Amino acid sequence: WIMGHMVNAIEQVDEFLDLGANAIEFDVDFDDDGVAKYTHHGMPCDCGRSCTKYAVFTEYLDYVRQVTTPGDPKFRKELVLLALDLKLQRISSEKAYAAGVDVATKLLDHYWMRGWNGGRAYILLNIPLVEDYEFIRAFKDTLRKEGHEQYNAKVGINFTGNEDLDEIREVLEKLGEDEHIWQADGITSCFPRGTERLKKALEKRDTPGYKYISKVYAWTLVRSSIMRRSLRLGVDGVMSNYPDRVVKVLKEKEFSDKFRLATYADNPWEKFTPI
Protein backbone atom coordinates (compact mmCIF):
# COMPACT_ATOMS: atom_id res chain seq x y z
CA TRP A 1 0.00 0.00 0.00
CA ILE A 2 1.43 3.37 -1.02
CA MET A 3 -0.34 5.88 1.19
CA GLY A 4 -0.40 9.48 0.03
CA HIS A 5 0.18 11.63 3.12
CA MET A 6 -1.95 14.61 4.22
CA VAL A 7 -4.29 14.60 1.20
CA ASN A 8 -6.64 17.19 2.70
CA ALA A 9 -7.93 19.20 -0.27
CA ILE A 10 -10.36 17.64 -2.73
CA GLU A 11 -8.13 18.51 -5.71
CA GLN A 12 -5.23 16.64 -4.07
CA VAL A 13 -7.04 13.28 -4.24
CA ASP A 14 -6.51 12.80 -7.98
CA GLU A 15 -3.11 14.48 -7.79
CA PHE A 16 -1.82 11.81 -5.36
CA LEU A 17 -3.47 8.98 -7.29
CA ASP A 18 -1.76 10.24 -10.45
CA LEU A 19 1.57 10.02 -8.60
CA GLY A 20 0.97 6.33 -7.89
CA ALA A 21 -0.79 6.18 -4.50
CA ASN A 22 -3.38 3.44 -4.00
CA ALA A 23 -4.35 4.75 -0.55
CA ILE A 24 -4.77 8.25 0.84
CA GLU A 25 -4.47 9.59 4.36
CA PHE A 26 -6.33 12.73 5.38
CA ASP A 27 -6.65 14.61 8.67
CA VAL A 28 -10.01 14.88 10.41
CA ASP A 29 -10.26 18.00 12.56
CA PHE A 30 -12.92 18.23 15.29
CA ASP A 31 -14.59 21.08 17.13
CA ASP A 32 -14.56 21.09 20.95
CA ASP A 33 -17.69 18.91 21.07
CA GLY A 34 -16.17 16.13 18.98
CA VAL A 35 -17.92 17.07 15.73
CA ALA A 36 -15.80 16.30 12.64
CA LYS A 37 -15.68 19.56 10.68
CA TYR A 38 -12.78 19.67 8.22
CA THR A 39 -10.03 17.65 6.60
CA HIS A 40 -7.23 19.85 7.85
CA HIS A 41 -3.79 19.42 9.43
CA GLY A 42 -2.70 22.93 10.39
CA MET A 43 0.69 24.19 11.55
CA PRO A 44 3.22 22.73 12.02
CA CYS A 45 3.26 19.91 9.49
CA ASP A 46 5.71 18.04 7.28
CA CYS A 47 8.71 19.81 5.82
CA GLY A 48 8.10 21.09 2.31
CA ARG A 49 4.31 20.76 2.54
CA SER A 50 1.52 23.31 2.81
CA CYS A 51 -0.18 22.71 6.18
CA THR A 52 -3.29 24.78 5.51
CA LYS A 53 -5.13 22.97 2.71
CA TYR A 54 -8.56 21.77 3.78
CA ALA A 55 -12.07 20.72 2.79
CA VAL A 56 -15.38 20.40 4.63
CA PHE A 57 -15.32 16.82 5.96
CA THR A 58 -18.72 15.79 4.54
CA GLU A 59 -17.89 17.29 1.11
CA TYR A 60 -14.59 15.42 1.11
CA LEU A 61 -16.42 12.15 1.89
CA ASP A 62 -18.88 12.87 -0.93
CA TYR A 63 -15.96 13.27 -3.33
CA VAL A 64 -13.98 10.17 -2.30
CA ARG A 65 -17.22 8.18 -2.45
CA GLN A 66 -17.48 9.04 -6.15
CA VAL A 67 -13.81 8.19 -6.72
CA THR A 68 -14.32 4.75 -5.12
CA THR A 69 -17.71 3.85 -6.63
CA PRO A 70 -17.50 1.66 -9.77
CA GLY A 71 -19.57 3.16 -12.57
CA ASP A 72 -19.19 6.73 -11.33
CA PRO A 73 -17.56 9.06 -13.90
CA LYS A 74 -14.94 9.99 -11.28
CA PHE A 75 -14.13 6.35 -10.37
CA ARG A 76 -10.44 5.45 -9.97
CA LYS A 77 -9.96 1.73 -9.45
CA GLU A 78 -6.53 2.19 -7.86
CA LEU A 79 -7.86 3.90 -4.71
CA VAL A 80 -8.56 1.01 -2.35
CA LEU A 81 -7.89 2.38 1.16
CA LEU A 82 -8.83 5.58 3.00
CA ALA A 83 -6.91 6.33 6.20
CA LEU A 84 -8.62 8.86 8.47
CA ASP A 85 -6.02 10.56 10.66
CA LEU A 86 -8.32 11.47 13.54
CA LYS A 87 -7.00 14.57 15.32
CA LEU A 88 -8.42 13.45 18.68
CA GLN A 89 -5.37 14.73 20.56
CA ARG A 90 -6.73 18.25 19.96
CA ILE A 91 -9.92 17.63 21.93
CA SER A 92 -10.67 16.35 25.43
CA SER A 93 -10.53 12.55 25.81
CA GLU A 94 -14.04 12.79 27.25
CA LYS A 95 -15.23 13.79 23.77
CA ALA A 96 -13.69 10.75 22.04
CA TYR A 97 -16.98 8.82 22.27
CA ALA A 98 -18.97 11.71 20.75
CA ALA A 99 -16.37 11.96 17.97
CA GLY A 100 -16.74 8.25 17.19
CA VAL A 101 -20.51 8.58 16.89
CA ASP A 102 -20.14 11.61 14.61
CA VAL A 103 -17.56 10.08 12.25
CA ALA A 104 -19.50 6.80 11.94
CA THR A 105 -22.72 8.70 11.18
CA LYS A 106 -21.03 10.88 8.55
CA LEU A 107 -19.47 7.85 6.87
CA LEU A 108 -22.90 6.17 6.81
CA ASP A 109 -24.57 9.25 5.32
CA HIS A 110 -21.88 10.55 2.97
CA TYR A 111 -19.62 7.62 2.10
CA TRP A 112 -21.51 4.35 2.42
CA MET A 113 -24.89 5.99 1.68
CA ARG A 114 -26.43 3.46 4.07
CA GLY A 115 -26.18 0.78 1.41
CA TRP A 116 -27.32 2.84 -1.58
CA ASN A 117 -24.39 2.64 -4.00
CA GLY A 118 -21.75 3.84 -1.56
CA GLY A 119 -17.97 3.83 -1.92
CA ARG A 120 -16.12 0.53 -1.78
CA ALA A 121 -12.72 1.47 -0.28
CA TYR A 122 -11.50 0.00 2.98
CA ILE A 123 -11.42 2.46 5.89
CA LEU A 124 -8.56 2.70 8.38
CA LEU A 125 -9.28 4.62 11.59
CA ASN A 126 -5.98 6.18 12.68
CA ILE A 127 -6.18 6.99 16.37
CA PRO A 128 -3.35 9.07 17.85
CA LEU A 129 -3.26 7.75 21.42
CA VAL A 130 -4.59 4.72 23.31
CA GLU A 131 -6.37 7.04 25.77
CA ASP A 132 -8.83 7.86 22.96
CA TYR A 133 -9.96 4.23 22.63
CA GLU A 134 -13.61 5.19 23.36
CA PHE A 135 -13.72 6.48 19.77
CA ILE A 136 -13.60 2.88 18.55
CA ARG A 137 -16.32 1.74 20.94
CA ALA A 138 -18.55 4.61 19.83
CA PHE A 139 -17.90 3.95 16.15
CA LYS A 140 -18.87 0.27 16.46
CA ASP A 141 -21.85 1.08 18.72
CA THR A 142 -23.15 3.53 16.11
CA LEU A 143 -22.92 1.03 13.24
CA ARG A 144 -24.81 -1.48 15.39
CA LYS A 145 -27.53 0.97 16.48
CA GLU A 146 -28.01 2.21 12.92
CA GLY A 147 -28.37 -1.36 11.64
CA HIS A 148 -25.25 -1.28 9.46
CA GLU A 149 -22.84 -3.66 11.15
CA GLN A 150 -21.95 -5.04 7.71
CA TYR A 151 -19.53 -2.12 7.34
CA ASN A 152 -17.36 -3.47 10.14
CA ALA A 153 -15.93 -5.75 7.45
CA LYS A 154 -14.53 -2.65 5.72
CA VAL A 155 -13.08 -0.94 8.82
CA GLY A 156 -9.70 -1.33 10.49
CA ILE A 157 -7.99 0.19 13.53
CA ASN A 158 -4.53 1.72 13.86
CA PHE A 159 -2.90 3.51 16.80
CA THR A 160 -0.40 5.99 15.38
CA GLY A 161 1.28 7.59 18.42
CA ASN A 162 4.29 5.24 18.58
CA GLU A 163 3.14 4.00 21.98
CA ASP A 164 4.24 0.76 23.64
CA LEU A 165 3.02 -2.17 21.52
CA ASP A 166 1.94 -4.18 24.56
CA GLU A 167 -0.09 -1.23 25.88
CA ILE A 168 -1.82 -1.02 22.51
CA ARG A 169 -2.57 -4.76 22.68
CA GLU A 170 -4.05 -4.35 26.18
CA VAL A 171 -6.42 -1.62 24.98
CA LEU A 172 -7.47 -3.73 21.99
CA GLU A 173 -8.13 -6.66 24.34
CA LYS A 174 -10.24 -4.40 26.56
CA LEU A 175 -12.26 -3.37 23.50
CA GLY A 176 -12.61 -6.98 22.35
CA GLU A 177 -10.87 -6.15 19.05
CA ASP A 178 -8.49 -8.75 17.66
CA GLU A 179 -8.79 -8.38 13.90
CA HIS A 180 -8.47 -5.69 11.21
CA ILE A 181 -5.54 -4.12 13.07
CA TRP A 182 -2.74 -2.15 11.45
CA GLN A 183 0.29 -0.79 13.25
CA ALA A 184 1.97 2.41 12.12
CA ASP A 185 5.47 3.45 13.08
CA GLY A 186 7.01 6.75 12.16
CA ILE A 187 7.65 10.42 12.54
CA THR A 188 7.23 13.63 10.56
CA SER A 189 9.50 13.70 7.51
CA CYS A 190 11.50 16.55 9.10
CA PHE A 191 13.26 14.18 11.52
CA PRO A 192 15.16 10.90 11.22
CA ARG A 193 13.82 7.82 13.02
CA GLY A 194 15.44 4.50 13.89
CA THR A 195 13.90 1.11 13.20
CA GLU A 196 13.79 -0.43 16.69
CA ARG A 197 10.02 -0.14 17.24
CA LEU A 198 9.25 -0.87 13.59
CA LYS A 199 11.20 -4.14 13.86
CA LYS A 200 9.28 -5.05 17.04
CA ALA A 201 5.95 -4.44 15.30
CA LEU A 202 7.01 -6.59 12.34
CA GLU A 203 8.16 -9.33 14.71
CA LYS A 204 4.76 -9.35 16.42
CA ARG A 205 2.97 -9.38 13.05
CA ASP A 206 5.01 -12.41 12.03
CA THR A 207 4.50 -14.31 15.29
CA PRO A 208 2.16 -17.26 14.57
CA GLY A 209 -1.12 -16.84 16.43
CA TYR A 210 -0.54 -13.16 17.30
CA LYS A 211 -3.79 -11.43 16.36
CA TYR A 212 -3.18 -7.81 17.24
CA ILE A 213 -1.21 -6.72 14.16
CA SER A 214 -2.07 -7.81 10.64
CA LYS A 215 -0.26 -5.05 8.70
CA VAL A 216 2.60 -2.67 9.48
CA TYR A 217 3.50 0.54 7.68
CA ALA A 218 6.18 3.21 8.05
CA TRP A 219 5.55 6.96 7.82
CA THR A 220 6.29 9.63 6.53
CA LEU A 221 9.05 8.55 4.16
CA VAL A 222 10.49 10.99 1.63
CA ARG A 223 14.01 9.67 1.01
CA SER A 224 14.41 6.69 -1.30
CA SER A 225 17.11 5.23 0.98
CA ILE A 226 14.65 5.10 3.92
CA MET A 227 11.98 3.58 1.67
CA ARG A 228 14.44 0.83 0.73
CA ARG A 229 15.35 0.28 4.39
CA SER A 230 11.66 -0.18 5.32
CA LEU A 231 10.98 -2.50 2.38
CA ARG A 232 13.97 -4.67 3.31
CA LEU A 233 12.45 -5.07 6.77
CA GLY A 234 9.20 -6.27 5.15
CA VAL A 235 6.63 -3.52 5.72
CA ASP A 236 3.17 -3.84 4.19
CA GLY A 237 2.89 -0.16 3.37
CA VAL A 238 4.73 3.12 3.08
CA MET A 239 3.21 6.54 3.71
CA SER A 240 4.87 9.29 1.72
CA ASN A 241 4.56 12.84 0.47
CA TYR A 242 6.00 11.52 -2.80
CA PRO A 243 4.20 8.34 -3.93
CA ASP A 244 6.05 8.50 -7.26
CA ARG A 245 9.35 7.92 -5.42
CA VAL A 246 7.93 4.79 -3.77
CA VAL A 247 6.74 3.54 -7.18
CA LYS A 248 10.24 4.08 -8.56
CA VAL A 249 11.89 2.18 -5.68
CA LEU A 250 9.43 -0.71 -6.04
CA LYS A 251 10.52 -1.08 -9.68
CA GLU A 252 14.14 -1.63 -8.67
CA LYS A 253 15.46 -5.15 -9.22
CA GLU A 254 15.81 -5.80 -5.48
CA PHE A 255 12.09 -5.21 -4.84
CA SER A 256 10.25 -5.79 -8.11
CA ASP A 257 9.86 -9.54 -7.58
CA LYS A 258 9.04 -9.24 -3.85
CA PHE A 259 6.45 -6.45 -3.82
CA ARG A 260 3.55 -5.29 -5.92
CA LEU A 261 0.89 -2.65 -5.50
CA ALA A 262 -2.17 -3.77 -3.57
CA THR A 263 -5.44 -3.86 -5.50
CA TYR A 264 -9.06 -4.05 -4.36
CA ALA A 265 -8.78 -7.85 -4.47
CA ASP A 266 -6.17 -7.78 -1.68
CA ASN A 267 -7.64 -8.03 1.80
CA PRO A 268 -5.96 -5.40 4.02
CA TRP A 269 -6.99 -7.25 7.20
CA GLU A 270 -5.19 -10.52 6.40
CA LYS A 271 -1.56 -11.21 7.20
CA PHE A 272 0.47 -11.65 4.05
CA THR A 273 2.02 -15.08 3.78
CA PRO A 274 4.78 -15.42 1.18
CA ILE A 275 4.32 -18.45 -1.07
From Swiss-Prot:
**CDD domains in the record, alphabetically?**
GDPD_like_SMaseD_PLD
Q: Which cysteines are joined by disulfide bonds?
A: C45-C51, C47-C190
SUPFAM superfamilies attached to this UniProt entry: PLC-like phosphodiesterases
Q: Name where it's found.
A: Secreted
| Catalyzed reaction equations | an N-(acyl)-sphingosylphosphocholine = an N-(acyl)-sphingosyl-1,3-cyclic phosphate + choline; an N-(acyl)-sphingosylphosphoethanolamine = an N-(acyl)-sphingosyl-1,3-cyclic phosphate + ethanolamine; a 1-acyl-sn-glycero-3-phosphocholine = a 1-acyl-sn-glycero-2,3-cyclic phosphate + choline; a 1-acyl-sn-glycero-3-phosphoethanolamine = a 1-acyl-sn-glycero-2,3-cyclic phosphate + ethanolamine
EC annotation? 4.6.1.-
EC class name: lyase
Give the GO biological process terms.
Answer: killing of cells of another organism; lipid catabolic process
Q: What does this protein do?
A: Dermonecrotic toxins cleave the phosphodiester linkage between the phosphate and headgroup of certain phospholipids (sphingolipid and lysolipid substrates), forming an alcohol (often choline) and a cyclic phosphate. This toxin acts on sphingomyelin (SM). It may also act on ceramide phosphoethanolamine (CPE), lysophosphatidylcholine (LPC) and lysophosphatidylethanolamine (LPE), but not on lysophosphatidylserine (LPS), and lysophosphatidylglycerol (LPG). It acts by transphosphatidylation, releasing exclusively cyclic phosphate products as second products.
Task: Provide the protein name.
Answer: Dermonecrotic toxin SpeSicTox-betaIIA2iv
